[in-house]
């Protein structure tokens, strides 16, 4: 029995291995299929984390439209709403860190924390700093975010937060342009990386970038 999600981030390997051995057993089973075929396995099609307004995007771009939200996830909301929002921030020449994005996220959190979160059981409470998760692809941006955001806000790389969740998530991309990307655009715009970052959100996800 093999369990897992090959469409999220892979384990980092420090070793050198022959070509093809970096793929998991599940990736070999999938082949070119976007999700596991019915004759090869069982696709767990229900998300207990993401509100439908978040889940529908992830389902479409990653899971071939097969993923949907459980009713309990659909009952969660914030006073600022649900879904995925794009926050453009102007900056130039940034490679792995952006003070401009840190300032914008700090401003948004200061406003959002004044609102409320309603859980799946119908209970409503004031949002607090620990209800916010800020994800970045680079350690340099993580350090800037930790220095510039309120204590209690969870900040880390995409890899660190795999498996975790929060009512509101920010994905700070930091890089100003493709020419400024220190690795390559395939890393920055990796489908698996975007999947993990956005799908941490129970209610609201903000994509913050140049």
Which stretches of residues belong to each language-model region?
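Conserved helicase motor core of SF1/SF2 NTP-dependent helicases
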Residues: 1-210
């Amino acid at each position: 029995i093999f369990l897992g999600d090959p469409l999220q981030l892979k384990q980092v390997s420090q070793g050198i291995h022959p070509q093809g051995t970096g793929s998991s057993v599940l990736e070999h089973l999938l082949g070119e299929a976007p999700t596991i075929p019915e004759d090869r396995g069982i696709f767990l099609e229900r998300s207990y984390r993401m509100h439908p307004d978040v889940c529908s995007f992830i389902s479409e771009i990653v899971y071939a439209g097969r993923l949907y939200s459980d009713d309990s996830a659909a009952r969660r909301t914030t006073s600022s709403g649900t879904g995925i929002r794009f926050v453009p921030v102007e900056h130039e020449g940034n490679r792995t860190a952006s003070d401009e994005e840190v300032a914008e996220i700090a401003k948004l959190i200061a406003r959002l924390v004044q609102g409320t979160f309603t859980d799946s059981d119908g209970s409503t409470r004031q949002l607090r700093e620990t209800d916010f998760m800020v994800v970045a692809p680079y350690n340099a941006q993580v350090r800037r975010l930790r220095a510039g955001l309120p204590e209690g806000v969870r900040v880390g790389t995409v890899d660190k937060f795999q498996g975790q969740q929060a009512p509101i998530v920010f994905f700070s991309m930091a890089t100003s342009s493709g020419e400024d990307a220190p690795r390559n655009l395939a890393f920055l715009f990796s489908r698996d990386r975007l999947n993990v970052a956005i799908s941490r959100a129970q209610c609201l996800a903000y994509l913050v970038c140049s």
